[in-house]
From Swiss-Prot:
Species the sequence originates in: Meyerozyma guilliermondii (strain ATCC 6260 / CBS 566 / DSM 6381 / JCM 1539 / NBRC 10279 / NRRL Y-324) (Yeast)
Gene Ontology cellular-component terms listed: endoplasmic reticulum membrane; GET complex; Golgi membrane
Lineage: Eukaryota, Fungi, Dikarya, Ascomycota, Saccharomycotina
Region: Disordered, residue numbers: 15-59
Keywords from the UniProt entry: Endoplasmic reticulum, ER-Golgi transport, Golgi apparatus, Membrane, Transmembrane, Transmembrane helix, Transport
Name the record gives this protein: Golgi to ER traffic protein 2
Superkingdom per UniProt: Eukaryota
Record-linked HAMAP family: Get2
Length: 280
């Protein structure tokens, strides 16, 4: 025999089955109308239409998906004007006149390579950067001029001194001891004291001129425009340790100038002896 709980469960299931079949509103009205002469038209919540009943069976997602908003195009000129002159005050580029902003004007001059107008405006102002570059170029040109002037002056002094020494001994020595020759007899003649004095005077002149040239070169600033120095400077951009060898290279270049100084003078002496070797 079923217990009370089972009876309640069976009744509850029957009630739910009847409500699921519909007619819940009629049953509710019948219950509410018992003992009353006025019939109400109450509607059960089970019979009320739900929002889900109006949903379509299938929907295209492209119709409900949010469309991407187009990105606004960037105005580069407006951005530059706002960055360069947006906070410059009433007299700057914020008023729509970038030419009246001194900072913007300076930037434009720098991008254009500098011109006669600078930070001081259009009334005879000069660009400090272009003026500095022009000064550096003039300084380099002046240093090159000083170096060439020193070299040319010493070249003239060297040639005059060597030629004077050679001509003097050539005219004062009457025999063939001062002339080179392939004749064994002439080559066997011992040199006289005059021939030895020529080389002594030559060595003395070279020593004096070399010392004077080194002293004069130190007073002229070097521009470091040699190919070797430029190569070291470019290589130091990738290998910074090479920069410490640049002073040593400058000293070697200075010593090489002195060596070529003496070698050129010796070459001139050899040339002069070769010219008089045709004398018989």
């Amino acid at each position: 025999m079923p217990s009370d709980r089972e009876k309640q469960r069976i009744l509850r299931e029957r009630r739910q089955a009847k409500m699921a079949k519909g007619g819940a509103s009629d049953r509710l009205n019948k219950i509410l109308s018992q003992g009353s002469s006025v019939k109400t038209s109450a509607v059960s919540v089970l019979d009320q239409p739900q929002p889900a009943d109006h949903d379509p069976e299938g929907m295209d997602i492209s119709t409900i998906a949010s469309k991407p908003t187009p990105e606004p195009e960037l105005d580069i000129d407006a951005m530059l004007n706002s960055v360069l002159g947006g906070n410059m005050g009433a007299g700057g580029a914020a008023n729509g006149d970038p030419g009246s902003d001194p900072f913007t004007q300076m930037m434009m001059n720098m991008m254009q390579g500098g011109g006669p107008e600078g930070m001081l405006g259009q009334e005879g102002g000069t660009n400090p950067m272009s003026a500095n570059m022009e000064y550096q170029q003039q300084l380099i040109a002046y240093n090159l001029y000083q170096q060439r002037k020193v070299r040319h002056r010493f070249l003239v002094v060297r040639m005059v001194s060597i030629l004077a020494n050679f001509v003097y001994h050539f005219l004062t020595i009457s025999d063939f001891s001062f002339s080179p020759s392939a004749n064994p007899f002439i080559r066997s003649i011992p040199p006289t004291s005059s021939v030895s004095s020529f080389f002594q005077i030559f060595v003395a002149i070279e020593a004096v001129l070399v010392a004077a040239y080194i002293a004069a070169s130190r007073n002229v600033p070097s521009n470091n425009n040699g190919l070797l120095v430029k190569g070291i400077s470019m290589a130091a951009m990738f290998v910074p340790k090479l920069q410490r060898f640049q002073p040593l290279i400058m000293k070697i270049i200075g010593c090489w100038d002195t060596v070529t100084f003496v070698l050129n003078d010796l070459g001139l002496v050899v040339l002069l002896f070769g010219l008089i070797s045709f004398r018989r």
